[in-house]
């Protein structure tokens, strides 16, 4: 996967997910790690979107933390993307293309995570988020703008 096509903030969220995996002695980067990275790096973005969607961000964050703590621990080895995390990032790329973007922004990563079955998407769905409402909130946030290189 070419991370050069991800915005700086998206790259930071992925890097944060890698740090979380290392700090917890885990090996695979799961969607829940990516969601935690987005929550930490894109706090203003997620705050806006979750407020629009009526989501209790604190509760969602706590669920994410509990899930991360429950994952298996290992010693050694380099972190790698799990199949679900890879699928979520591919969905984010597809969503970005649909929006006419050249770069994958945090909100596209959030949509990608929502679209791939995992604990991360289950937490968002349990919080009351739907694909249609998330898409509408993203559209409102972006006001029709695209991320293209000029």
For each of these PLM feature ranges, what is it?
Residues 1-147:
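Histone-fold recognition with a strong bias for associated Lys/Arg-rich disordered tails
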